[in-house]
Amino acid sequence: WRMIWEHNTRNIIMLTQTVEKGKIKCDHYWPFDNEPIVSGDITIQMTSESMLPEWTIREFKITHGANTRRVRQFHYTVWPDHGVPETTETLVKFIRYVRRTIDGEAKHTGPTIV
């Protein structure tokens, strides 16, 4: 979260599940619900979660001192447990959705994290 704050990141793209074949592959770094979590001196609160058939969009409010920002996570949720998707159709739809969503944003925001 410090990197997200320091680089003024507004969008996170996640392509994997947190667990694959029973092994942890990615830390669950975001809150499970609207209860805030604290990472160092940064507070993270999920403000919305839209679960779609192939991806989930989460919005977070992150606070550092008296400053607050909004961060969005695009989580592609149908990547198979092992290997690659059988077709690229849903992944291409996901990429197009993400691009449409973030293309109109202000140019003064930081890099998207994948």
UniProtKB/Swiss-Prot annotation:
It holds the Pfam family Y_phosphatase. It comes from the Eukaryota. It is an enzyme of class 3 (hydrolase). Keywords: Hydrolase, Protein phosphatase. Substrate binds at residue 81. Residues 1-114 form the Tyrosine-protein phosphatase domain. SMART domains: PTPc (SM00194). Its EC number is 3.1.3.48. One of its GO terms (molecular function) is protein tyrosine phosphatase activity. It catalyses: O-phospho-L-tyrosyl-[protein] + H2O = L-tyrosyl-[protein] + phosphate. GO terms for cellular component: receptor complex. Belongs to the protein-tyrosine phosphatase family. This is Tyrosine-protein phosphatase 11.
